[in-house]
Amino acid sequence: MTALVEVVILTYMKTRFFLDNLPPFIMTHPTCSLICSLVHFDRGYEANHLRRAIAETADFNVDGLCNFRLQEVMQNWSEVAELASRLVSSTERDTYDVASFITSTEGAKNRIAIDHGRVFNLTEGREVQILPVFEEYEYNLIMAIVGQNPKEIIVEHTNLSNEMMSTLKHVAGVVYRN
């Protein structure tokens, strides 16, 4: 149950939080990479905080967890959203630079493969779940990949848009094989 609550709060709700608290923008690959970087930023700290909050409560009321037991985490999200708000209207390069910086602070360590549209963490020897967070498949792919702290991304037997390939190159080193 804890893993499910973690996914709901730290992926879906955190994504929704940033989408609701950034100035209006058109979703593009660069802004998606920024949002995904923000969502995965501080994931370890937030997951530990959430586990402690769950252990101390008798029920799994998500609103109660967020509004009372996770106030410190939610305040951090607000501060990050405020800082990121200035980037939404920045250039594509600035957006990618900040997204790359945020991602790199979590420590790039994994080799990732995209093969036939599926994502694999080669370092950990497992398939990565691609959650349906956004309406567009490539944006969900960005979310899945950024969450793996990639140092290298191998793309095989998968046709991705030029924008997606450009985004991946800003996230980590890319090897393209067909």
Task: Pin down the residues of each PLM region.
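Conserved mixed alpha/beta catalytic, RNA-binding, or beta-rich assembly cores of soluble enzyme
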Residues: 1-139
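C-terminal structured domains
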Residues: 117-178
